[in-house]
């Protein structure tokens, strides 16, 4: 068999083999990559949130609360964010963030493959070994994707250090890049990024750190912000200023290296000093009680989620100047009441020299080199008492100041049953060396006391000019509240619910149901005038009565404040002088009249009458209700007086003027047509709507005017006479309960209705028998009203010409017409009810209606 011969066999080309292998590997790798990507996409892409449309971008943003005159009063948020359009973000700020976070942002497709892979490997190793550091590897697009995931899935799930989370983040980043422009991604990122200091987004950060708008930032300020996203806490300019400065230098260096800024700009920004500020707590600093009541109202109507996330603009009816005046009046008046209670002793007694030295050293560290500033409060230590006991040396930090006896004349032992001026002290003997005190620095001797009754030149001490002086203070124990209403605009202009919101958020204006005392008497007399046809000149009998309650086996014997009796008096005199017995007798007559001699039914009818005026709380089912024994809320008492001011028309009182959503669309609007702070558009729209809300006539205009005139007399010459210092026509009523547990003064001018209350929260003991409404509450009312109405004339309380009212001069004793004389007074009457010449007016003068006491 012959050999096989191969003919024309080509030579092997060995050099092609590597290329074939490479091709095979590339094909296999590509196939694996596609399959792998498909598998990853199938496994992890399910449930990824939709890419947000930029024009429908709705991140959580803060709700802002403003006063009626545009002052920021509070903010509420989960994330403090303000969305700013991309066009308003400075180019340099955009460049700073790109330089710091993602220098190749405009060149990549959304994902840093190497960084993400490295982060995934290290995350896996960390999970297996428990060692190592979890590492990030995110572009700006990936960070934006993470924010979208957090919004859709919640913080915990979307920030978990897992491979799954990183993959989902990368997949979403690719979607973002495919569906949005780079500028749109930056818009989302710069409004979402957390920058510490309660700041989400660059606008919020600009405000929080620098108190500026983002468009006004300097390059140095921009670089500092751009350095924060990686670790806001670590690079905080507050807690780590040196790290923040180094990080800022890094950002500026990156910007220079990338050609974003010149060498000169780099040099200037590197040298620039950047001032940062703490976040202003406007809620607590300005009007916490008012703002908190606003928050509750918004939550009740729209829900907490809307408040915290939807960026409402809430415009309250609060007048910022009136609110400040109210807060100052409450503080000043409450401190005065508390001092009249007496001195409760030092904050602490340091008996040993070692304890005293330790306190002084600590105080030095706190004070540093600060000077003693008049008007400020300090905690000091008594280090020496003068031999004559007329002054004490107080050490504040390392400085010694003088406390003369004049600065603590009020510091007697606590005793509310002794009249204050008679127990003023003339020395500093209540103090001991080692006492830790609250003192207030004063400018000169005149500032040592606000109390004219306590002034004494001899107790001011002889000191060199300019020597630091202080006066003794103490944290007040009683509470106070004030509420002020513009009756015509129906605006709640000012409100203070207590002495210290931080110590107790309980808002006494809305939440404290307190006995109004004699403040309720105008309601009783309004009922008698309205229902029984009584007049200002109706003769009442001020004589002793006893009320027996066989059902409860009680005997009640009301008495006047002065415990005396005046016999026959006119109704106006009875109210002006706040006489108790005529008010009780009027209440009894009214109950018998309305109940057709059935007093139980009659008291229920009076209760209905009071509720019709605006009270929500029930009257006690007995005659003590005449003297204000049934509790009322301060806001409701003020609203009822506002109804009287409006000639008997009841209308709602608003403390929210309007609410707008994040786009400026109106959510609700109660703007008054004559609101000087509102836009013409708001005034016209809301004013037109109010034409169809005329209010409810719950008291005839004639009766309302007569009650106003009665209360005008209280201010002109009765228990509220001190209110004449206002220098403007006012009408109102004092209120004092048994044992002075509550002290009130509620009064109004034509344009402003204000109610002030003073008392203890839990009634541990009374304010003291001399702390009447006229002494404890009226000064707060007056201090507020003098500032609130400064420069504003108030018209007299003249009746409208259309009302059928007439004036007559009446004899004070008989109620008959009188020509002249000191025993007569001019009164208003509804036409047809004025007395005749020859016959005394009849009504409550029949003393036989009541059980007489021998």
Predicted regions and their residues:
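Active-site beta-strand/loop architecture of penicillin-binding DD-peptidases
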Residues: 287-306, 480-515, 526-527, 644-645, ...
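Soluble, non-transmembrane domains of envelope/secretory-pathway proteins that act on or interact
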Residues: 1, 10, 280, 351-365, ...
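N-terminal type II signal-anchor transmembrane helix
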Residues: 1-66, 104, 337
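Active-site-proximal helix/loop microenvironment
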Residues: 273-274, 279, 283, 318-319, ...
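Non-catalytic structural connector segments
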Residues: 132, 262-372, 558-563
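Active-site SXXK
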Residues: 97-98, 255, 326, 489-490, ...
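Conserved catalytic neighborhood of penicillin-recognizing serine enzymes
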Residues: 125-154, 215, 282-285, 488, ...
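Peptidoglycan glycan-strand catalytic modules in the bacterial/periplasmic cell-wall system
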Residues: 3-7, 12, 29, 60-62, ...
